[in-house]
């Protein structure tokens, strides 16, 4: 990075070099816009990140915790929630308008934004057509903090109803650890076998943890 680059203010640096050139503190400073009394915006940004440990911690904070931080309030909370939701919808639209699912990373990022911070286990299915384009996504089963009862026949029933040719399975582990259990492996195999009887392919099963994930396809388990 050049000396000129390091002396630019965040807004000017973004305009000249792009958003990816900014670090977390600089990005947050643009979002905050102004500092508070005796605390310039860059210093406030640094304090906020230290308080929440990371951007992820800030984004995941509930309203009460968020607004307890000096310099933050309901306006910033609402704006941040709106930005987060727009990101989710952008990723979903990327999947919806893609000609086919050629980017597993886009699928993973979307599933992470949807499932990573849920406090209950949710089992989601992406239903795809024969060219692997998204038909619909559906939260099929909602469970407790550590378990969701999954009924493979209900998944197949929905797949047949929307004429899906392929499926991507996903669920979260609220514990934060994405390592699959034996029950996860058995359930995935049951869905795969039942799907094959109906000539429907299971392309992958993602398990989403806190800042980590597990892909059955990447491990060669599907």
UniProtKB/Swiss-Prot annotation:
The Swiss-Prot or TrEMBL record annotates one GO molecular function as: metallopeptidase activity
**Which processes are annotated in GO (biological process)?**
proteolysis
Taxonomic lineage from the root: Bacteria, Pseudomonadati, Pseudomonadota, Gammaproteobacteria, Pasteurellales
* Residues making up the signal peptide according to the UniProt record: none
MPN domain residues: 99-222
Annotated Zn(2+) binding sites: 171, 173, 184
Q: Name one Pfam family in it.
A: RadC
Q: List the disulfide bonds.
A: none
Cite the entry's keywords alphabetically.
Answer: Hydrolase, Metal-binding, Metalloprotease, Protease, Zinc
* Protein name (record): UPF0758 protein HSM_0009
User: Matching InterPro entries, A to Z?
Assistant: MPN, RadC_JAB, RuvA_2-like, UPF0758, UPF0758_CS, UPF0758_N
Q: Give the residue interval(s) assigned to the motif JAMM motif.
A: 171-184
Q: Which family does it belong to?
A: Belongs to the UPF0758 family.
